[in-house]
Amino acid sequence: MTKSEMAAALNSKSAWLPGKRVKLDFGSEGVVMLDGAASQVTEEDGAADTTIKVSWQDWQDMSEGRLDGMTAFMQGKLKVEGDMSNAMQLQGVLAKL
């Protein structure tokens, strides 16, 4: 799945936290913004309540079950900036993929 395909899938399933802006920052691969304030998922950068930084490859590994999110966090492969509770709530939202 490409980043654009992922953003479209999340958008079609309303996969955001109401009233919250959460940015998935894939470094040089770009970003996906789960914008609960605007009720949409985009590939546009901007200010966020929570930013999750992870490489695109590690993200793919997590989404395909080859890498556990908590393990990635403990190994420093996944970093969270801002409101940590939003990151915790995303587990259920991202299960919609």
Map each language-model feature to its residues.
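Feature captures hydrophobic
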Residues: 1-97
